[in-house]
Amino acid sequence: MRVSIADALGRASARLSEAGCDTPRLDAELLLAEALGVDRERLVLDAAEPLGEGASERFDALLARRAAREPVAYILGRKEFRRITLAVDPRVLIPRPETERLVEVGLTVPPGARVIDVGTGSGAVALALKHERPDLTVLGVDLSADALEVARANAARLGLDVDFVLGDLLNGVEGPVDGVLANLPYVAEGVGLAPEISRYEPPAALFGGPDGLDVIRRLVAMAKGVPVIAMEVGLPQAVSTLLERAGFESIEVLRDLADHERVVVARG
């Protein structure tokens, strides 16, 4: 006997909860909608409908991956970020809501400015900024050629004119720089992370040395004279001190949606 969509969701939610997933019901809904090829809203309307055999098999396969703590974004192959949807896979860090604060800073630069997204990964910050401020010239830089493949594919699919270059922070960036946005590795080595992160996301995009500041220190030293720099960080006070010592005068710390101090903004 085939189970209803509602029953399938209930069982899946229980399974994911037992596996330790933080949002089991939401995850189950997203995966079932994917298996059925419908929007999540349709699951409510069709809750009493039986789940077909083919959809059931697809759903079970997706659930098995999530129960192994693979992130939903990697399972689906996409992640929403501000007003765009990005393709993502284990070559790049999954864009997170707190990183949207970097885009908000980028939106404040003068018309026609040139902004560099350092450590661009999937291209999330660069592409979201260009989408909302087409007047800007935006360049994405990353040390990973694999990540740049993902970023360029996202730009092409979204039809956004953003260049991406292989490089180490600001080394090799020529021409004027009116703003720098950076989500660099800032997790200290040895810090325990959730399985979704530790097992699946690229370590090079996460860990920033013994105190998590190795890469950030290098960028701060390179960015002297840049009108504005914004960085997502784990130690906002330490980063603020680095920026102050580098000669930046106006420094503020922005909170994310969870009310954590997450982004440091400095103006020269």
Which residues does each PLM region occupy?
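Non-catalytic accessory regions of SAM-dependent methyltransferases
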Residues: 1-44, 51
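Conserved Class I SAM-dependent methyltransferase catalytic core
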Residues: 210-266
